[in-house]
């Protein structure tokens, strides 16, 4: 049996955690890059009531969108990776 840290789903999970640490560091210190205003489709997503109520983790809307996208991707990767591990 392989080590857990060598599995792809675990590496994806670590990448998600590192991104969250970066986002928190930037939010707390204000040392992050300046972002443009949102227009078009991303702005429509951020302005949804559901998104503002339940998925607003940071003050920066770009961080919120990236967090939701990476979170969904990470969950899918973990589920598929663990099911492959169980089958083997």
From Swiss-Prot:
Membrane topology label: Multi-pass membrane protein
Parts of the chain that traverse the membrane: 13-33, 62-82
InterPro entries tied to this protein: YfzA
Pfam families linked to this entry: YfzA
Keyword Transmembrane helix among record annotations: yes
Gene Ontology CC terms, in alphabetical order: plasma membrane
Superkingdom in the source lineage: Bacteria
N-terminal signal peptide: none
Alphabetic keyword roster: Cell membrane, Membrane, Transmembrane, Transmembrane helix
Subcellular location: Cell membrane
Protein name: Uncharacterized membrane protein YfzA
Organism: Bacillus subtilis (strain 168)
């Amino acid at each position: 049996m392989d080590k857990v840290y060598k599995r792809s789903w675990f590496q994806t999970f670590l990448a998600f955690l590192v991104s969250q640490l970066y986002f928190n560091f930037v939010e707390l210190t204000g040392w992050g890059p300046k972002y443009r205003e949102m227009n078009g489709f991303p702005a429509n997503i951020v302005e949804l009531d559901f998104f503002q109520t339940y998925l607003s983790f940071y003050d920066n809307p770009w961080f919120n969108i990236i967090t939701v996208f990476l979170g969904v991707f990470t969950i899918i990767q973990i589920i598929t990776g663990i099911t492959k591990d169980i089958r083997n």
